[in-house]
Amino acid sequence: MTIIRKKHPLIKIINHSFIDLPAPSNISSWWNFGSLLGLCLIIQILTGLFLAMHYTSDTSTAFSSVTHICRDVNYGWLIRYMHANGASMFFICLFLHVGRGMYYGSYNMIETWNMGIILLFAVMATAFMGYVLPWGQMSFWGATVITNLLSAIPYIGTTLVEWIWGGFSVDKATLTRFFAFHFILPFIITALVLVHLLFLHETGSNNPTGLNSDADKIPFHPYYTIKDFLGVLILLMGLMILVLFFPDVLGDPDNYTPANPLNTPAHIKPEWYFLFAYAILRSIPNKLGGVLALILSILILALLPLLHTSKQRGLTFRPITQTMYWILVADLLILTWIGGQPVEYPFIIIGQTASIAYFTIIVILMPMAGMIENNILDLD
């Protein structure tokens, strides 16, 4: 068995990636989220495949086909809710994975980090298009509002929006193409994940100390396969509690009303995992400015290697930057809350303050804290 594992041209790639991979001996449970994201992707592809067998991407039957899946298909309700709540678990793992990378300075592995940002954009695009497919009220109006943002692009904006819509409004052509893209993107994401792993295995994993761990490595299997399996059990338990007890808690009640272009919902809002970016978008009165802020709220992650001023890699031994980091986490939670609130006083001013704080902490305060900590270290 060992000979096959180490000599077979295909199996040896798997062996070097998941079995004999040298891993730092001290990586904590924060390093579990990569494998959990892989599991989420597999769950989403499998449940999505079975949903696609029964779904019809036509405006007149899309809503009914989703109802049919829940009522008439064997365990259709389970597949549908696993897919919908699986997306939420996916984003929880994604945010924790990115947060871990920011905390421990993993962004210094630039190729892996940039690949991760591309993956984040791809997953967000996939989730947005998936939300449109049930063709409920929030699906329709969410699609209308978000695609309309592209009209803020000077000169080509309006043409671009109509090109994406396939007409002069969100209609049959839009739904069909969104279904096509929503189906193909997870497979593209899978390919990007392999590239992400390829870059990661070029440098090896980071660790909580931020120090070089070449002198102290252990094989991935059995140590981290067992450790990851515990994470898998916790994730699956969390997902099944959501699916079986609170399947609609993260959804919007408006999406149980079929799409009606003549009736606008009181508050148009995306799924919870986009609310922080939506709050940043809404906090700027200018349309183009809002769109740029929206894109920058994610793209700013690409600047982190340039904004790294500390002599140390992670925040493990840096209390000032740690404080800034946790204020940033609290700020993101405030933005998420504001994104789900109506556009009125006092939510407008809270959103604007939180948006300014978000960019200020990342671009100014954290790099400054790094320099202050360097000076404190030099004082000895």
From Swiss-Prot:
Gene Ontology biological process terms from the UniProt entry: mitochondrial electron transport, ubiquinol to cytochrome c
Coiled coil residues, start to end: none
Subcellular location(s) per record: Mitochondrion inner membrane
Entry binding sites for heme b b566: H97, H196
Segments traversing the membrane: 33-53, 77-98, 113-133, 178-198, 226-246, 288-308, 320-340, 347-367
Alphabetized Gene3D superfamilies for the sequence: Cytochrome Bc1 Complex, Chain C (1.20.810.10)
Binding site for heme b b562: H83, H182
Topology in membrane: Multi-pass membrane protein
SUPFAM superfamilies to which the protein is assigned, alphabetical: a domain/subunit of cytochrome bc1 complex (Ubiquinol-cytochrome c reductase), Transmembrane di-heme cytochromes
Cofactor note: Binds 2 heme b groups non-covalently.
Major subcellular site: mitochondrion
Record has Secreted as a keyword: no
Assembly notes: The cytochrome bc1 complex contains 11 subunits: 3 respiratory subunits (MT-CYB, CYC1 and UQCRFS1), 2 core proteins (UQCRC1 and UQCRC2) and 6 low-molecular weight proteins (UQCRH/QCR6, UQCRB/QCR7, UQCRQ/QCR8, UQCR10/QCR9, UQCR11/QCR10 and a cleavage product of UQCRFS1). This cytochrome bc1 complex then forms a dimer.
Identification of the protein by name: Cytochrome b
UniProt source species: Alticola macrotis (Large-eared vole)
Name of encoding gene: MT-CYB
